[in-house]
Each structure stands twice: as C-alpha cells, then as structure tokens.
Swiss-Prot record:
Organism of origin: Rhodopirellula baltica (strain DSM 10527 / NCIMB 13988 / SH1)
Protein name stated in the entry: Probable glycine dehydrogenase (decarboxylating) subunit 2
NCBIfam families referenced in this protein's UniProt entry, alphabetically: PRK04366.1
GO cellular component: cytosol; glycine cleavage complex
Self-association and partners: The glycine cleavage system is composed of four proteins: P, T, L and H. In this organism, the P 'protein' is a heterodimer of two subunits.
Length: 500
C-alpha cells in the first residue's frame, strides 16, 4: 500500500481554470503583448504551468515537509555531519531588519553595526583556532579548503618554490583531494595504520621537496584524535611543507585544544556544523579560513579592519570599521561582496551565547555522548579502532553481514522505521561496512538509550523484515542504479509536453 501512495506533483494536481487569486476588471487601457515583443521572443503556445488554488499549493508543500526527517523532528546521528539542534533564537536575531535588509552596495557608514559584528567574529575565529589571520569570504567548507590552498600556492610562488603536491589522508573527506586538484596541485594519499591514525612511515615516504601541504583532519573521520600530531608536525615542517587542518570536526575540541597550537598553518571552519549555521537546503553557507601570520597577507579579501577615531565623543563612535584588502599580495576575491553574512551572524550569536567556557562544555558533552553510545554499541557491532573516541565513532557491520546477511545499508534503512535518521554508512572508506555515528552534544541520555535499543533490536530481527525495510516511509528502497543512469528530471504530460 505504501508504494501506491506516491505524492502527486503540482502538475498532476492541476485543474484547468483553477486560480489562487482572481483579478478585478481591467481599469486601464489594455495592451496587446504581441505588439510589445518581437515574434522570436514569444512562445507559440502557453507554458503548461499548473493551475491551482493557494490552499492546494500550501497543502502540497506542507505535506512534503512532513515526509522529511530533520533535526527539529528526529534524532539525526549522521556521522561526520554534526547534526546538532540549533537554537531558534539565533534564527530570530539573524532575521532582524538591521541584518536582513542591508544591501551589499550600501556605503560603509551605513553598515557600521554589521561590520563591528564581523570584526569581532574574525577575532573569535582567530582565538578559537590559534591562527591570527582570518578571512570569512568563502561560501562553504570546501570553498574554504580551496581558498586556503590558493593562499598556500601564493606563498610558495612568492618563495620561488615549485612545490606542487598535496598529501591527503585516506580517511579524509572527499573534498580534500578535490580542492587540491582545483587549486592546481597534484595529490597523493597517505595511508592509515592499524589504529586508524596516520601511518608515519607512509607519510615519511611521501614527503619530499615537491610537497606543499599535508591536509589533515584531527580528530579524523574515524572519530580519533591523532596522538602522533607532534611528530606529524615536525615531519611536515622539517620537509618545508605546510599543515592544513580540515576543521570539519572542530565540534570535538572547542576550548580544549587549538589547531594552531598543535601545528596547523591553515584551516577552515564549517559554521553549519559547529556554529549553528543551517544544514542543507543548498546553502547559503560559509567556510571561514584562518592562517598563521606569515600567510595572512595572501588571504582573500575583503576583511574587516578597525580604526580608532581621534575625535570620538564616547564608546559609541570610538571606532570606525572598514572593508579592506589584506594586502597587495592577496589572492583576491573568492566571493562577491563580503561573504554570506547571514550565516556569519548566526555564528557570532552562537559564540557570544556560549563564551569560552561554554564552548568547552559543548565539546565535552559531544565527546561524552559519543563515548556513551560506543560503550553500548560495541557489544553487538564490531568497533575496529578501540573503546574510546572523540565526537563520533565508526562501527562495522562486516560480521553481521557474514553471519546474518545484515549490511550497513540494511541497518540504515531499518532504523528509519524506529523513528531515527540513519547514521552515515560506507564512509570512511577505510572501514568495511562502516556505520558512522555522531550524536552531538544536544541529545539526552534517553534519546541515546532509545537509539541503542533500536540498533540492537535490528541485529536480532529476521532477514526478510530487514531487507524490505523501511516499512513506514512513503518510498522504501528506490532503484539507485536506474535513478542514476536514467533520471527523470522534468515533468511530461500525457501528450509529451514538458514544463521546461
């Protein structure tokens, strides 16, 4: 019954002559559209747009929204995504007219409040990272990676160096090698050792006078803090290369340690993961980057600077804020105007709300929750990298697949029937049948216990029940291969007319 109840498209709900609003009689002279445009600019037939009442449209989209899982409706343990609950006050404050209605072409004199906020946020990002140079221009995490690697390229170019290789870990996010390629570098992969950490011998073998950057995620995507970081730091820097820290997992170390303190030269933040930027929806996002002093002049601009007013009458006009280029050596703009400020405003509110001590509690609670889950899950799923983790952990369904024909994908599909979003599966690639779980700091012990109970029950269920799951969703298991090879990307009516 479930699969027969597919949601109808607006085009299928359409009825000829139905309208959302009706216009009054024309009280101005009518105009013939044919006389206003050239023949080639006019369509021969009207587009087959849906004809619907407003209520029909609202019910359609609200109905679709109820089919989705979200952080606001379900526990969302999607590993490597930090799907934490974000306070709604951040959304309300970011929507204040003074933030929402500014125009990027306004003169700086009319943007002083916003520029002051951005200036303070630059300082916060610098303090959290231990890296003083900050640009908030990039529009997402991967964009931040690209911008930072372009900074590294500019640095080596000015040094007269022909270093053109970026090393990435085999457990890294796929954006790492992709960003390196886009920045004009060649890439080599550094293997993990049996403990899930960087294989130092492989790193030594691949470091040479062509190595520009080693891109490291720490904690890594296995949820492990690399205890070899001091040795990694020495090896890379002794080879004349830079260390890039993928800040995707900063939620595990806020206020506990700083990338700059353990050797990173460049890094990016993911505000949508760590600092209450909205997840999903295609953006907008932000990917602020932080660098050491000697790299700051290459940062993309503009950045916000502050000038003290000599004739200030009080604190309200003590400073003036300006958008400026970091230097003549800047790599230039990587984003129009001054970045996606709406996301940055949310990050500022989040950081001001928690403060330094509060951020440390965020990470401590995130790590505590992940270790609590790991201590339970290890009794019925294999955990290949020990009994301790940081903010997330990776289990394996390999044994279950062999003994019970229960795969990681089966677990992910069946858990939906229990009212939980699926964990990440089959990533990172270094773990067979990977099940990656990240609970975040915003979930209660009761929620974590219920999730563990659901996972355990799934491992005890029959094959047929699991292989046909999910049973409670509108669509069960789509044919992924056919969808990829023969996608239907536009609506076509019975006569073959499309809406595009």
């Amino acid at each position: 019954m479930r699969n027969q109840q597919s949601t109808q498209l607006l085009f299928e709900l359409s009825r000829a002559g139905r309208r959302a609003h009706r216009l009054g009689d024309l009280d101005v002279p009518s105009v013939n559209v044919d006389e206003l445009f050239a023949d080639e600019a006019l369509a021969e037939t009207p587009p087959p747009l849906p004809e619907l009442a407003e209520g029909d449209v609202v019910r359609h989209f609200v109905g679709l929204s109820t089919l989705n899982m979200s952080v606001d409706t379900h526990f969302y343990p999607l590993g490597s995504c930090t799907m934490k609950y974000n306070p709604k006050r951040n959304e309300r404050i970011a929507s204040l007219p003074g933030f929402l209605n500014v125009h990027p072409l306004q003169h700086e004199s009319g943007l002083q409040g916003l520029l002051e906020l951005l200036y303070e946020l630059q300082g916060m990002f610098a303090e959290i990272s231990g890296l003083p140079g900050v640009s908030m221009q990039p529009a997402a995490g991967a964009h931040g990676e690209l911008a930072a690697l372009l900074v590294a390229a500019a640095y080596f170019r000015e040094q007269g160096s022909d270093r053109n290789v970026v090393l990435t870990a085999d457990s890294a996010h796929g954006t790492n090698p992709a960003s390196a390629q886009m920045a004009g570098f060649k890439t080599k992969t550094v293997k993990s050792n049996a403990n899930g950490l960087v294989d130092l011998e492989d790193l030594k073998a691949k470091l040479d006078d062509k190595t520009a950057v080693f891109m490291l995620t720490n904690p890594n995507t296995l949820g492990l803090f690399d205890r070899q970081i001091e040795e990694i730091n020495k090896l890379v820097h002794d080879a004349g290369a830079l260390i890039y820290l993928d800040g995707a997992n900063m939620n595990a170390i806020l206020g506990i340690t700083r990338p700059g303190d353990f050797g990173a030269d460049l890094m990016h933040y993911n505000p949508h993961k760590t600092f209450s930027g909205p997840h999903g929806g295609g953006g907008p996002g932000a990917g602020p980057i932080c660098v050491r002093d000697f790299l700051a002049k290459y940062l993309p601009g503009p950045i916000v600077t502050r000038v003290e007013n000599e004739n200030a009458s009080g604190d309200d006009d003590r400073y003036t804020y300006h958008l400026t280029s970091p230097s003549d050596d800047s790599i230039g703009r990587v984003r129009s105007f001054f970045g996606n400020t709406g996301v940055l405003v949310r990050a500022y509110i989040y950081l001001r709300t928690y403060g330094g001590d509060g951020l440390r509690h965020v990470s401590e609670d995130a790590v505590l929750g992940a270790n609590y889950l790991l201590s339970k899950v290890k009794h019925f799923l294999d955990v290949p990298h020990g009994d301790r983790c940081m903010h997330e952990f990776v289990a394996s369904a390999t044994r279950l697949k062999k003994e019970k024909k229960l795969s990681a994908m089966d677990i992910a599909k069946r858990i939906l029937d229990y009212g939980f979003h699926a964990p990440t599966v089959y990533f990172p690639l270094v773990v067979d049948e990977a099940v990656m779980v990240e609970p975040t700091e915003t979930e209660s012990k009761q929620t974590l216990d219920a999730f563990v109970e659901a996972l355990f029950r799934i491992t005890e269920e029959g094959e047929e029940l699991i292989h046909d799951a999910p049973h409670s969703t509108r669509i069960s298991r789509p044919d992924d291969v056919t969808a990829a090879r023969r996608p239907i990307l536009k609506w076509t009516d019975a006569a073959g007319e499309s809406a595009t």
